[in-house]
């Protein structure tokens, strides 16, 4: 024992400087072996990519956080240099190939969601977008699927039209007061007040809120978007935020606790109404919360946490994505007067209702309106980044590169939407491309594909049909301090532009 002690004492450094040298040497050796292993002995060692991306996670961290969410924009240049199959980080592969997108994300795909991404960044593990297990996801989605069918949209359309009418009134007020209109915030009001009707048959009256106010919901949405990649790289921050003293957490994530409290109150209110035998909205509709509390298939109700997570998720997913698309569509159309006039000409002969508004059933099939919306969706790509999946047990080979089981793979929506082989001049707003080639619909992947596609896509389409048709024929607008620079976006889970789209309502259209 004494001999062993002497050996240890002789080996250990005797001074602080020697200790520092030992620690530095150990760290250096560890780092070198880690880099060597990832470059030459890793299952993905033969996949091409930048040296730093293949060897260190810090490369992705740098793109996501230091440079502010621009990795998805840099994929094109990297793929041009390294080929269609790119090692974007030590354990993740990005593929720039629209056919690969459909291979991975379409119905019947064996590629499961990557839990390291979907379970980590959102903090809502029981919400549909975060559920990894395919069968559990199928059962959960089935509970509410009928609410989002085309038939259900007809029943909901009169409520959405009322919301749009209220927003138009707000735009009229800005015209009369000669005030600049933050139309992106107004569109956000349309989407929030609509999704609240779907969730729990109520409205937050966001359209009527003062522009200088930031309600708890918006504060939460902004904070989450600004910190999306920080939470992705350091998911422990979510746990910390939810477990530190409330007084501190409220400063770090403003609005979060107030919004969560509102959600819980909505759930309790609906549960109380169920106990009194009231299980539908006043107009006979069932809401998302209704069906989650009392499934129509006779199954067990979800836990309170699951209902809360689902409600939270719907509120987020159903708000920014659509308002961003409508805002950017407004920017594109106001920047192209001839195309805006073409849209107005198509709408002019369409009959309006007694309130002088276009209805969903009369405009949803108009070719040029659809083309304008599709082009707005393509160019704005509200969720532009990666949605990783895991290669199934049998592995796969793509473009000569073998990807072993469990590899995290992705193909970003933005990469598909800007592929010049499919969309010539992808940076230009050309609605006519959708009229000339019906096959392009296959490559409009903004809502995803298959059983994992966005469940609320019909709601988003309806909101946009009603907003575009009524706003562009009721108002004459010009852009205010909104241009290519102000609408430049970064990936924050959602696409976030530098400044909101703002307009002046010059006159009311006759």
Curated annotation (Swiss-Prot):
GO CC annotation, single: membrane
Superkingdom, taxonomy of origin: Eukaryota
Listed GO MF terms: heme binding; iron ion binding; monooxygenase activity; oxidoreductase activity, acting on paired donors, with incorporation or reduction of molecular oxygen
Top EC group: oxidoreductase
Annotated transmembrane regions: 16-36
Membrane topology: Single-pass membrane protein
Recorded metabolic or biological pathway in which this protein acts: Secondary metabolite biosynthesis
Compartment list: Membrane
Induction: The botrydial biosynthesis cluster genes are co-regulated by the Ca(2+)/calcineurin signal transduction pathway, which is under the control of the alpha subunit BCG1 of a heterotrimeric G protein. Expression of the cluster is also positively regulated by the cluster-specific transcription factor BOT6.
InterPro entries the UniProt entry points to: Cyt_P450, Cyt_P450_CS, Cyt_P450_E_grp-I, Cyt_P450_sf, Cytochrome_P450_monoxygenase
UniProt KW keywords: Glycoprotein, Heme, Iron, Membrane, Metal-binding, Monooxygenase, Oxidoreductase, Transmembrane, Transmembrane helix, Virulence
Entry-linked Gene3D superfamilies: Cytochrome P450 (1.10.630.10)
Residues the record lists as binding heme: 454
Keyword tRNA processing: no
Disruption phenotype: Abolishes the production of 10-beta,15-alpha-dihydroxyprobotryane, botrydial, and of some of its relatives.
Cofactor requirement: heme
Sites where a glycan is attached: 476
EC number of the protein: 1.-.-.-
Family assignment from sequence similarity: Belongs to the cytochrome P450 family.
PANTHER family, sorted: CYTOCHROME P450 (PTHR24305), P450, PUTATIVE (EUROFUNG)-RELATED (PTHR24305:SF152)
Protein's job: Cytochrome P450 monooxygenase; part of the gene cluster that mediates the biosynthesis of botrydial. Botrydial is necessary for colonization of plant tissue by the T4 strain. It is a strain-dependent virulence factor since highly aggressive strains like SAS56 or B05 still retain substantial virulence when botrydial synthesis is impaired, since they produce also botcinic acid. The first step of botrydial biosynthesis is performed by the sesquiterpene synthase BOT2 which catalyzes the cyclization of farnesyl diphosphate (FPP) to presilphiperfolan-8-beta-ol (PSP).
Protein name stated in the entry: Cytochrome P450 monooxygenase BOT1
Lineage: Eukaryota, Fungi, Dikarya, Ascomycota, Pezizomycotina
